[in-house]
């Protein structure tokens, strides 16, 4: 290992022991990923970083990657070894069990000063198999060494072609989906199993039919009417309850007995002493 590579490894190892205050996030630039993380990994396969995990992307689906990462809320970083389809070829195997990663757009050059040091490739995950794969909103940025750091210019000890992958899920508006919304174990608030509310027409119909209840009725007839109306209106929420019916009938009977005492000996025709106005219903709900 040459002096420059050795020095880079030492610097990065020193950074591993820095205690950062709360609130700091791992948000490196493209050049920082190449210079401070990918190059040391290529020179020393035992190199590790606090914020970057190590996975085989061909064995893990994108929606499982957030829980394989060391840290990250909206994007997750990994060291990966590119899986060549053929030993002497340049094509990379990007298939998983559920689908495949497909490159999109043109690779972006990454510079350190005026020197080309790396390239960034953008890929999108498709479910199924080409050419009938279904596009998802999972995106990956793959960083590789290039220019003076190109694999051809590295020592023979750098046998594996390491890359850094940044994975995230993208919304339609371009924003990234946070991990808290991806976690299948979070208990989201679901609507309770309550009876559906009435619409306006049902409510008006229910109110109209019960706004003036006949004052004199026997228990059997009244119970049947209430149960019938409850099915048309609020279901069995209140009025089909036998205890509720019994209590209200007892109240009505008590009130009516008082009316019978007051008007004993007089035929009751639903009018007051003046004979001009209708009595309000005793049981009006």
Curated annotation (Swiss-Prot):
DNA-binding feature ranges: 117-176
The recorded induction information for this protein reads: High levels during senescence (e.g. age-, salt- and dark-related). By salt stress in an ethylene- and auxin-dependent manner. Induced by H(2)O(2). Accumulates in response to abscisic acid (ABA), ethylene (ACC) and auxin (NAA). Repressed by high auxin (IAA) levels. Age-related resistance (ARR)-associated accumulation. Repressed by miR164.
Q: State the Gene Ontology terms under molecular function.
A: DNA-binding transcription factor activity; protein homodimerization activity; sequence-specific DNA binding; transcription cis-regulatory region binding
Start and end residues of each NAC domain: 20-170
Show the SUPFAM superfamilies listed in the entry. Answer: NAC domain (SSF101941)
Instruction: Give the record's PTM text.
Output: Ubiquitinated by NLA. Ubiquitination of NAC92 leads to its degradation by the proteasome during leaf senescence under nitrogen deficiency.
Q: List the expressing tissues.
A: Mostly expressed in roots and flowers, and, to a lower extent, in shoots and leaves. Particularly expressed in old and senescing tissues.
An individual GO BP term: floral organ senescence
Any phenotype upon disruption?
Answer: No visible phenotype. Delayed leaf senescence and flowering. Increased tolerance to various types of oxidative stress including H(2)O(2), salicylhydroxamic acid (SHAM), N,N-diethyldithio carbamic acid (DDC) and methyl viologen (MV). Impaired age-related resistance (ARR) against Pseudomonas syringae pv. tomato and Hyaloperonospora arabidopsidis. Increased seed germination rate under saline conditions and delay of salinity-induced chlorophyll loss in leaves.
**At the top level of its lineage, which domain of life is listed?**
Eukaryota
Q: Keywords for this entry?
A: Activator, Apoptosis, DNA-binding, Nucleus, Transcription, Transcription regulation, Ubl conjugation
GO annotations of cellular component type:
nucleus
Keyword Iron-sulfur appears in the UniProt entry = no
Compartments, record wording: Nucleus
Q: What does this protein do?
A: Transcription activator that binds to DNA in promoters of target genes on a specific bipartite motif 5'-[ACG][CA]GT[AG](5-6n)[CT]AC[AG]-3'. Promotes lateral root development. Triggers the expression of senescence-associated genes during age-, salt- and dark-induced senescence through a regulatory network that may involve cross-talk with salt- and H(2)O(2)-dependent signaling pathways. Also regulates genes during seed germination. Positively regulates aging-induced cell death. Involved in age-related resistance (ARR) against Pseudomonas syringae pv. tomato and Hyaloperonospora arabidopsidis.
- Free-text domain note: The NAC domain includes a DNA binding domain and a dimerization domain.
Question: Subunit notes for this chain?
Answer: Forms homodimers. Interacts with GLK1 and GLK2. Interacts with NLA.
**The protein's name in its UniProt record:** NAC domain-containing protein 92
Taxonomic classification, please? Eukaryota, Viridiplantae, Streptophyta, Embryophyta, Tracheophyta
């Amino acid at each position: 290992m040459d002096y420059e590579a050795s020095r880079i490894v030492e610097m990065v190892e020193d950074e591993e022991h820095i205690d950062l205050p709360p609130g700091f996030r791992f948000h490196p630039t493209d050049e920082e990923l190449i210079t401070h993380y990918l190059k040391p990994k290529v020179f020393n396969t035992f190199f590790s970083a606090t914020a970057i995990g190590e996975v085989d992307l061909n064995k893990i689906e994108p929606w499982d990657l957030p829980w394989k990462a060391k840290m990250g809320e909206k994007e997750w970083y990994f060291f990966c070894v590119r899986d060549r389809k053929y030993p002497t070829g340049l094509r990379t195997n990007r298939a998983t069990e559920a689908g495949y990663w497909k490159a999109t757009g043109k690779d972006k050059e990454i510079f350190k000063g005026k020197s080309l040091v790396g390239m960034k490739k953008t890929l999108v995950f498709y479910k199924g198999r080409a050419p009938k794969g279904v596009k998802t909103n999972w995106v990956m940025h793959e960083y590789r060494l290039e220019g003076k750091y190109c694999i051809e210019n590295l020592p023979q000890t750098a046998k594996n072609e390491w890359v850094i992958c940044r994975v995230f899920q993208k919304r339609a508006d371009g924003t990234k989906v946070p991990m808290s919304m991806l976690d299948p174990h979070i208990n989201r608030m679901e609507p309770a199993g309550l009876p559906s509310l009435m619409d306006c027409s049902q409510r008006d119909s229910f109110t109209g039919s019960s706004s003036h209840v006949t004052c004199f009725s026997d228990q059997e007839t009244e119970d049947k009417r209430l149960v019938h109306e409850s099915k048309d209106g609020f279901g069995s929420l209140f009025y089909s309850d036998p205890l509720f019916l019994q209590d209200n009938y007892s109240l009505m009977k008590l009130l009516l007995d008082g009316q019978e005492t007051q008007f004993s000996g007089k035929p009751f025709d639903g009018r007051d002493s003046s004979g001009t106005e209708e009595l309000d219903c005793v049981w009006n709900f």
